[in-house]
Amino acid sequence: MLTDLVQIRREGERVQGDNERLRKHLKAHPVAERRLRRIAENVEDQIDCRSCANCCRRSTVRLSDHDIQRLSKALRLKPPRVIADYTLPSEEEGLILRRDDERGCVFLDNNDCLIYEDRPDICRDYPHLIRGPGSLMSRMWHMPERASVCPIVYNTLEAYKDEVGFVRRG
């Protein structure tokens, strides 16, 4: 199981074309979702997300109104103050959590999330293989890119390719 983040980034980028083809394969084979879910559950059991936190350093976190309310309560600040202090407007995403170029999410301290119990839904569901809105197939759009960020995504996609005999070109 590959967990070194430098290798994950390099290998994830190297196999991105294969992962794009895999996404099309999965869309055309609905029964594949159960197999992929089973593999993802197995990989998630073997990798401790909280020891990695790479998603917190490299991903954009879109916030819902519910997330703002939850953060407001946790931080004991009114929603307008949370928005002013901890978010940025994004033309494509609405409100997003502020990020620091060096460490990522403003709530990340080393690999610890300072708001873990009250983190946004998108963070709770990450890497969106098992949890998240809609079907796994509907969430597959971002998986080729996430394979270079998340050891769980990378290892899940590689294990699935092995299991089904997917022909690699990358």
Residues of each region from the PLM?
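Short loop/turn segments that flank or connect secondary-structure elements
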Residues: 1-170
